[in-house]
Amino acid sequence: MADVKELKQVLTGPIINNNPIALQILGVCSALAVTSKMETALVMSLALTVVTAFSNLFISLIRNHIPSSVRIIVQMTIIASLVIVVDQVLQAYAYEIAKQLSVFVGLIITNCIVMGRAEAYAMKTPPMMSFMDGIGNGLGYGAILLGVGFFRELFGNGSLFGIEILSKISDGGWYQPNGLLLLPPSAFFLIGGLIWVIRTYKPEQVEAKG
């Protein structure tokens, strides 16, 4: 049984020290697509966190009974089932957001973070640790998405969660929105900036030269 200190380390480690996007460079595609608004970034973060946490838990529970030759198929079946449940819940209770997220919720099935944690961690670790690892990696993923979404929505549209923060010129205000920030490639530059900030704060994360 893992102690509280171990669980805390597993939960908080992926947020900064081993962030799946900033350090491992995983899950970048969805970070480009769903961060033009804070609302979609938050919902996508929650969806991935739920899928990663529970797929880790279920895979860990049966890890000793999965034949090595079919382990990837079993992992993908569990992940796909959870993604379907999450997608149906979103369509039932948050239909407008589900439409905005479009296919990207379904693509969680192939997200490198989810598959990577299932194979590299849940297959070798007890259930509680695996569950907390899934939550931690989901929070780390969400932290980057929300950081990128904050800058893109605020400076690209003058709002946060759809609420006007910077009064736009078109509405008689003073702020001219930067439309470039609403284009998916802008997320590349923002993610790069966040990685630079994190690695300035944590120089041990910088790759060795030569």
Curated annotation (Swiss-Prot):
Highest taxon in the source lineage: Bacteria
Record EC number: 7.2.1.1
Gene Ontology molecular functions: oxidoreductase activity, acting on NAD(P)H, quinone or similar compound as acceptor
Transmembrane intervals: 14-34, 42-62, 72-92, 96-116, 131-151, 178-198
Localization (cell): Cell inner membrane
Class in the EC hierarchy, top level: translocase
An example Gene Ontology biological process: sodium ion transport
GO cellular component terms attached to this protein's record: plasma membrane
InterPro entries associated with the record: NqrD, NqrDE/RnfAE
Quaternary structure note: Composed of six subunits; NqrA, NqrB, NqrC, NqrD, NqrE and NqrF.
Function field: NQR complex catalyzes the reduction of ubiquinone-1 to ubiquinol by two successive reactions, coupled with the transport of Na(+) ions from the cytoplasm to the periplasm. NqrA to NqrE are probably involved in the second step, the conversion of ubisemiquinone to ubiquinol.
Record-stated family: Belongs to the NqrDE/RnfAE family.
Annotated protein name in UniProt: Na(+)-translocating NADH-quinone reductase subunit D
Species name: Shewanella denitrificans (strain OS217 / ATCC BAA-1090 / DSM 15013)
Gene (name only): nqrD
